[in-house]
């Protein structure tokens, strides 16, 4: 089964949300307190997905707000050089800064992230700064859950979703749950559900679906049946090493294994999964193959130091799939 898009649209994907700075520990197997050296990368789930999509050959655009400083200029320059259209990146004029994420790599199984997300520029994107024409020209709008955490970013995303629905643009909701950006589980569930019920494709881990449903121990069947009662026609639920599942509204279920790799760190997997899965759908591959692309891409990224810089090419993904098929 294949997923279809409006081929007349100029952009394959437009992502909206945060673009920030990742500072990844260069020294492995030691705590943050003893780490002295970090490498700088562009970070943030929607930015990573846009970068990953562009590296795979898709026409990708980005809507977001960046600081008017060296970090903001680094983010815009890096994304533009990787092929992402940055004409809708708004430069903040009120002194807000970029979000910073310091990563600690104690072991492949034990990684943590120290986040600085107070008063960050990306959460100050205004609804008036979202271009209807830009979104109307995309096959899909990629929404990140974290962008719903605070106003005015929350309203900007809801406005973007309205524009997408108006212009027959597919809405892809990447749940991207980060607990440190939310006030309560009730708040998260309300806004996640609001967007998920307007989305055509919903992607997340089983734990993230439980967060959206404000419950524990939920089942895939209950989750997809609820979403299929609204706008969704494709739901992807990831189960870590057990692999991932895609459910279509027509009743088909697809599964992809988790590909074996030498794991360096655990972060970055979700963003690489989403970009490669989306690439698979847009390039005309069937849903099962798109799942394999997502799973293989995630395996590649967790074996490397960065997230954005490590996003693989289609050839690298295909080589891994072939090697383990």
From Swiss-Prot:
Coiled-coil annotation reads none
Q: Which InterPro entries match?
A: Carboh/pur_kinase_PfkB_CS, DKG_kinase_firmi, Myo_inos_IolC, Myo_inos_IolC-like_sf, PfkB_Carbo_kinase, PfkB_dom, Ribokinase-like
Q: What class of enzyme is it?
A: transferase
Q: In which pathway does it act?
A: Polyol metabolism; myo-inositol degradation into acetyl-CoA; acetyl-CoA from myo-inositol: step 5/7
Q: Name one Pfam family in it.
A: PfkB
MF GO annotations: 5-dehydro-2-deoxygluconokinase activity; ATP binding
The alphabetized list of GO BP terms reads: inositol catabolic process
Q: What is its EC number?
A: 2.7.1.92
Entry keywords, A to Z: ATP-binding, Kinase, Nucleotide-binding, Transferase
Q: Which Gene3D superfamilies match?
A: 3.40.1190.20, putative 5-dehydro-2- deoxygluconokinase
Catalyzed chemical reaction(s): 5-dehydro-2-deoxy-D-gluconate + ATP = 6-phospho-5-dehydro-2-deoxy-D-gluconate + ADP + H(+)
Its function, per the record, reads:
Catalyzes the phosphorylation of 5-dehydro-2-deoxy-D-gluconate (2-deoxy-5-keto-D-gluconate or DKG) to 6-phospho-5-dehydro-2-deoxy-D-gluconate (DKGP).
Task: Describe the family membership recorded for this protein in Swiss-Prot or TrEMBL.
Answer: Belongs to the carbohydrate kinase PfkB family.
Q: Which HAMAP family match?
A: IolC
State what protein this is by name.
5-dehydro-2-deoxygluconokinase
The organism is: Bacillus subtilis (strain 168)
């Amino acid at each position: 089964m294949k997923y279809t898009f409006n081929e007349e649209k100029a952009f394959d994907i437009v992502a909206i949300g945060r673009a920030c700075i990742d500072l990844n520990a260069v020294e492995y197997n030691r705590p943050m307190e003893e780490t002295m050296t970090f490498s700088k990368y562009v970070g943030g789930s929607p930015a990573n997905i846009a970068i990953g999509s562009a590296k795979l050959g898709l026409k990708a655009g980005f809507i977001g707000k960046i600081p008017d400083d060296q970090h903001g200029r680094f983010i815009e320059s890096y994304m533009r050089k990787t092929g992402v259209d940055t004409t809708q990146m708004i430069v903040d004029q009120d002194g807000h800064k970029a979000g910073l994420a310091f990563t600690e790599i104690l072991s492949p199984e034990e990684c943590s992230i120290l986040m600085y997300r107070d008063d960050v520029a990306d959460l100050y994107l205004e609804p008036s700064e979202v271009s209807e024409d830009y979104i109307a020209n995309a096959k899909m709008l990629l929404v990140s859950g974290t962008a719903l955490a605070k106003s005015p970013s929350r309203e900007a995303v809801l406005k973007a979703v309205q524009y997408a629905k108006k212009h027959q643009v597919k809405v892809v909701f990447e749940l991207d749950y980060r607990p440190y950006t939310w006030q309560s589980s009730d708040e998260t569930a309300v806004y996640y559900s609001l967007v998920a019920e307007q989305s055509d494709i919903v992607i997340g881990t089983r734990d993230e679906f439980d967060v959206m449903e404000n419950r524990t121990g939920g089942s895939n069947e209950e989750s997809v049946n609820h979403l299929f009662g609204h706008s969704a026609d494709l739901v992807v639920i990831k189960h870590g090493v057990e692999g991932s599942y895609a459910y279509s509204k027509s009743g088909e279920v697809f599964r992809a294994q988790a590909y074996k790799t030498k794991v360096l760190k655990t972060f970055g997997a979700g963003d690489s999964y989403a970009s490669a899965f989306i690439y698979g759908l847009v390039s005309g591959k069937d849903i099962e193959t798109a799942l394999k692309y997502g799973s293989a891409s995630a395996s590649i990224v967790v074996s490397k130091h960065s997230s954005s810089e490590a996003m693989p090419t289609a050839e690298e993904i295909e080589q891994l799939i072939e090697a383990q098929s």
